[in-house]
Structure formats: structure tokens, C-alpha cells
Swiss-Prot record:
<dbReference type="InterPro" id="IPR020004">
    <property type="entry name" value="UDP-GlcNAc_Epase"/>
</dbReference>
<keyword id="KW-0378">Hydrolase</keyword>
<feature type="active site">
    <location>
        <position position="212"/>
    </location>
</feature>
<comment type="function">
    <text>Catalyzes the conversion of UDP-N-acetylglucosamine (UDP-GlcNAc) to UDP and N-acetyl-D-mannosamine (ManNAc).</text>
</comment>
<comment type="similarity">
    <text>Belongs to the UDP-N-acetylglucosamine 2-epimerase family.</text>
</comment>
<dbReference type="GO" id="GO:0006047">
    <property type="term" value="P:UDP-N-acetylglucosamine metabolic process"/>
</dbReference>
<protein>
    <recommendedName>
        <fullName>UDP-N-acetylglucosamine 2-epimerase</fullName>
        <ecNumber>3.2.1.183</ecNumber>
    </recommendedName>
</protein>
<dbReference type="InterPro" id="IPR029767">
    <property type="entry name" value="WecB-like"/>
</dbReference>
<comment type="subunit">
    <text>Homodimer.</text>
</comment>
<dbReference type="GO" id="GO:0004553">
    <property type="term" value="F:hydrolase activity, hydrolyzing O-glycosyl compounds"/>
</dbReference>
<keyword id="KW-0413">Isomerase</keyword>
<dbReference type="Pfam" id="PF02350">
    <property type="entry name" value="Epimerase_2"/>
</dbReference>
<dbReference type="GO" id="GO:0016853">
    <property type="term" value="F:isomerase activity"/>
</dbReference>
<dbReference type="InterPro" id="IPR003331">
    <property type="entry name" value="UDP_GlcNAc_Epimerase_2_dom"/>
</dbReference>
<dbReference type="GO" id="GO:0005975">
    <property type="term" value="P:carbohydrate metabolic process"/>
</dbReference>
Length: 377
């Protein structure tokens, strides 16, 4: 029996990890241990740990790693301490983390420093913020890489990672997107009390390196949404530095045409996204999930500036007029053909590709002592 310790810190990463967590939980030779922390535990963001515990995983650990406004460095330290103590107790064979959040960095650090295998999902990607540095740091602490596409493979090889330890599995959330068990739009509207026939979705997160400018950017952004006259479904920003100023502005604009939620269940969010007129903000969902559904999206500012921009994506700066104009353009475009460029075009599900890796004995024989692989210089 192999024990895998996984960590989820946000509504977003849990939604993406769910298919893989279900596979591990139901595997006769694997034992899932899941830490639920970060935004999941915070009242401001809807205490989404309840969404995780609803899945009834056999081994789940709830940990509140921060108080509102606590510095990110302190939160990282809190998280490392908890994961380290739990890891010593349960002795996992592998630590599995996702993405570029500090909870993932904490898990990778603990795994690497305790000579346990670290498996990183969706490394090798680019955005446009400090998240890049965190993601690449996690990759350098990891032994096994489960990436979305060939571009990610190339970047990890450039970073000195061994090619045979990098596996393309696509993006796991796309398994959820293609699921036949998603609720209907009518069910979602009834659950959240949404009266709109037509609407756009807004997700606007802080950029930590621009935190001092977030009050100005947030004011300009939400003013543009109001001026557009569109019905807007907005989701609260994540809890990175600068979130308070965004949330303060967001709450000013709540009205019959602007409804905000601390969180929306991932599957329900996907249904809303699929039927939206457009998506606007700086979330990766506008770069990845929206194009797969053919939904036009407006990417605002620098947070996603280094990611692949498909033909359904309109990029703009933080100026109110430019955001307003981009929304008008998106509304005039209608739906696009589905774009699965990010996923590499493989017809297999991410879960199938994940199973291939996790059931391979060679995966478990990877040395915990990493070597830097030089390019041919």
C-alpha cells in the first residue's frame, strides 16, 4: 500500500484535483491522505472545506493556516510546520501538490527535506506574476512532474529536470468539464438564486507585485463592469496580498445586475461558464477553461501576461474605457469553436494518463536525490 499525501488550499485547485483524488481514494493499492487548508478554512471565502468533506475521503485533515491579513511569509511558515508534523506521523510515500500556491510550496519543501517523493501537477507554466517564481520553485523541489502539454515539458527541461520524469497528463479539470454528471443550468441558477438569462462572469484577483496599485486598478475595473450594463456574476478574489482593496470595491457594486459570491462549487461554476456571454478579469479560467467552451474572455492586466492567448481572448490594460470596450467587443463576437490547445489535443482523459504514471513501478523507484540535467551547451 502506497500512501499519497495531497494538499488543497483553494476552491480552484480542489476542483482540478477531484478526478485524481477520486482515483487514488478508490485504488486498492493506494491510500489517500488529504490536507485541507488555506482559503478553504476562511469564512470570508465561504468556508469551502465543507465542499471537500462532502466527498467523504477516508483520511482528511483540516488546518487553518492563517488569519485574515496575515503576511504570506508567516502563512507559509505555519503551513510548513503543520505539514511537516503530519508527514512525520503518517509517513507518506509521496507528497502530491498542484500549481503555484504557497500551500503547494510548503508541501514540496516538506517532501523534499524529508526525502519523500514529491509529485507536482501543472508545473512548467507561465503567468506574469510572482506566481511564476513560486511554481518554478515547487518544480525544483519535485521529483515527478505531471504537466499539461509539450510547452511545459520544454520549460522543465530548460530548468534542469530529467525528461523521463516529466509526464503529459493534460489538465485534470478538463475531465470535470467533459463529465456527463454536471448539473443543468437550471439547477445551478436555482441553487444560487440567479435570475439572469444572459450574463458575464467576473473573476479579478490581486497581483502581489502590484499590490500598492490594486485599489486604483480595482476601482477602474469594477466601474467598467458597471458601465457595460451587462448582468455580472462575480466571485470573490483569492487571498493574496492586495485582496482587501479588491473585495472592498467589489462589494460597493452589488446590485440587481451585479451578484457576488464568496465561492461557487467548481462543477456549478463550469456550467455557468459554459453558458456565459463572456468572462472578464485576470483568472486563469479565462485563458484555459473559457476557450475550451468557446466563451469569449477579456484578460485584464498582467496576471496572465505570459500565458498562451487563444483567438477567443481579448487582452486589455486596467483602464476603465479599455475594459469597457473589450466587453462590448466580446459581446459582439458570440461563441467560438472549442479550443483545446492548452490540453495538447490528447483524446484520453487526464485521469487515464495519471493512472498510467501512478501504476508504473518506475514512478515509485525515482530517486529522492535529484540531479540537475544540463542542456547540451
Amino acid at each position: 500500500m502506497k500512501r499519497i499525501l495531497c494538499i488543497t488550499g483553494t476552491r480552484a485547485d480542489f476542483g482540478k484535483l477531484k478526478p485524481l483524488l477520486a482515483y487514488i481514494e478508490n485504488h486498492p493499492d493506494l491510500e489517500l491522505h488529504l490536507i485541507v487548508t488555506g482559503m478553504h478554512m476562511m469564512k470570508t471565502y465561504g468556508r469551502t472545506y465543507k465542499e471537500v468533506t462532502r466527498e467523504n475521503y477516508q483520511h482528511t485533515y483540516l488546518f487553518s493556516n492563517q488569519i485574515q491579513g496575515e503576511p504570506m511569509g508567516a502563512v507559509l511558515g505555519n503551513t510548513i510546520t503543520f505539514i511537516s508534523r503530519l508527514s512525520d506521523e503518517i509517513e507518506p510515500d509521496m507528497v502530491m501538490i498542484h500549481g503555484d500556491r504557497l500551500e503547494a510550496l510548503a508541501g514540496a519543501a516538506v517532501g523534499a527535506l524529508s526525502s519523500r517523493l514529491v509529485c507536482h501537477i501543472e508545473g512548467g507554466e507561465l503567468s506574469g506574476t510572482v506566481d511564476d517564481s513560486i511554481r518554478h520553485s515547487i518544480s525544483k523541489l519535485s521529483h515527478i512532474h505531471l504537466v499539461a502539454n509539450e510547452q511545459a515539458v520544454t520549460r522543465l527541461v530548460q530548468m534542469g529536470e530529467k525528461r523521463k520524469h516529466i509526464h503529459i497528463i493534460g489538465s485534470p479539470d478538463l475531465d470535470v468539464m467533459a463529465s456527463s454528471t454536471l448539473p443543468s443550468l437550471e439547477e445551478v441558477k436555482e441553487y444560487y438564486g440567479l435570475p439572469y438569462e444572459n450574463y458575464g462572469i467576473s473573476m479579478f484577483h490581486p497581483v502581489t507585485t502590484e499590490a500598492h496599485l490594486m485599489p486604483q486598478y480595482a476601482a477602474q475595473y469594477f466601474k467598467a463592469l458597471e458601465l457595460s450594463g451587462q448582468n455580472i456574476i462575480s466571485i470573490y478574489p483569492n487571498n493574496d496580498t492586495g485582496t482587501e482593496s479588491i473585495l472592498q470595491e467589489l462589494l460597493k457594486y452589488q446590485s440587481d445586475k451585479f451578484i457576488a459570491f464568496p465561492s461557487i462549487r467548481f462543477e456549478y461554476f463550469l456550467v455557468l461558464l459554459k453558458h456565459a456571454k463572456f468572462m472578464v478579469g485576470n483568472s486563469s479560467a479565462g485563458i484555459r477553461e473559457a476557450p475550451l467552451y468557446g466563451v469569449p474572455s477579456i484578460d485584464v492586466g498582467t496576471r496572465q501576461s505570459n500565458r498562451h492567448m487563444g483567438k477567443s481572448i481579448i487582452h486589455t490594460d486596467y483602464e476603465t474605457k479599455n475594459i469597457f470596450d473589450a466587453i462590448q467587443q466580446a459581446c459582439s463576437l458570440g461563441k467560438f469553436e472549442a479550443d483545446d490547445t492548452f490540453n495538447g489535443g490528447d483524446t484520453r482523459t487526464s485521469t487515464e494518463r495519471f493512472a498510467e504514471v501512478i501504476n508504473n513501478p518506475e514512478t515509485w523507484n525515482v530517486s529522492a536525490q535529484k540531479r540537475f540535467i544540463d542542456l547540451n551547451l
